[in-house]
Structure formats: structure tokens, C-alpha cells
Amino acid sequence: MNKFYLMIAYEVTKASDGENPEMKKLIREVAKNNPEIMERCEVFTADRGYDDTEIITDLWDEHKVKAVIDIRNCWQDKDEIRMFENRQNIIGYDNFGTIYCYCPESGKRREMSFSGFEKDRESLKYTCPCKAYGVQCEGCKTCPYANKSVRIKMEEDPRRFTAIARSSHKWNREYDIRTSVERVNSRIDNAYGFEKHYIRGKKKMKLRVGLSLLIMLVMALGRIKEKQPERMRSLVARVS
């Protein structure tokens, strides 16, 4: 699915089939059959049902596509903070990849400021809150990271440390776009009559779904040819 709410690839499966294996197959098929699409693609968004390290790493390593996928809370303590090794017990992170620092004097925890993604280093850069926000910290004189930045390599934990930081506003904006899939599913159910259907058998269902998506794409193409791109998703507006 793209930002225009139009289908790029699809598959009809049994309800018992796993989503992640099917998604991996679809990504490989698009990369093989339509490499120009993967070359233009910058961000891949999906809900936590597709939270999978292999999907995230393959998208970045093979195609340099940034995955924006919600993460499941797999830690027993949802408020747990894990400390990085070789960071002098000062820098830590939570299950969602948010980076924190601890004052070496008071032990107070503060969220560090995300300062950007360094593609060449495949690292996320975070800045000391004293420098970023001007906060007062008792341990500034003794903290080795005071008024400095730290880099977190993606490879340390690809699920949590993604190219678009999970704690950033950009991540939230991109994640909201995933609703395009839900809107297309809603259109298939309502406009194309799949919510109440009497189709039996996977082959028949695949044919009907394929025809519906084809109609959707053809109508969008017609709108574009008629210089009405703003109506490419409309099913009822007249082509003048």
C-alpha cells in the first residue's frame, strides 16, 4: 500500500496463515518484480502484528527502507530500563527504544534528545538534556556525557533502534499513515460488498478480490489521465 491508498501487492490466504511470513514474501516479490517501487520507497509502516526483526533488518539492509512498525512489549516489567554496556551505567533504554541518561550524583533519570539519524554510520544520535533543553543537572561536572552526544548503533537492537527513532515526532507521523491499509480494507468490505458475501473457496475469493483491486487501480489511472489526481480514490465522482 502507498500514500495514495492504492494497492502495490497483495495475497489472499487462509485465516490460519501467519502474517509475517506472507509479508516477507510480498516484500521479496515487489523487490523482484517492481524494483523501481522499492527504489522510490523510503518508509514502510505496519502495526505491531508485523513486529519482526527480520522484516526490519531486511528492509534496511537490502533496500534502505526505514521500517516504522509498532513494537510488542516483550519485557515482563513494562517500565524496565536496561543499561548499555560500556556506558558507565549512565545511558539506558526502555522496551520502545527511548534513550535515557541518569545523573551520576542524584540518580535522576532524564530522556535524552533525539538529534538525528546518521545513515553512513547507521547510528541514532542523542544529545544530553542539559545541552538540548538547558536543564540543570547536579552531575554535569562529573558526567562523561555532559553537554555531549552519544551514538546508538542500529545493530545493537534492530527492533528498538530503527532508522526513524521511535521516540521522535516523525515516527508518530509516519505510523499514522498505516491507516491506508485499513481504509482499503474498509472499501473492499463496504463499496465492493465483501462484508456480506457468499463466496466459497480460496480460488473464487482470490479472483473476486483481484478484480476489485484491479477496478480500484483502473479508476485511479483514469482520474490521473483526466487530470483529476485529487479524485483518484473516489468511486462516485463523475469524470468530466
Pin down the residues of each PLM region.
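Alpha-helix N-cap/loop-to-helix boundary motif
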Residues: A15, A132, R173-D176
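Detector for glycine-centered tight turns/loop "hinges" at secondary-structure junctions
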Residues: Y5, N95-T98, G107, L124, ...
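Long, low-complexity, polar/charged, intrinsically disordered or flexibly structured peripheral segments
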Residues: K119-A163
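Polybasic low-complexity intrinsically disordered regions
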Residues: M1-K64, V68-W75
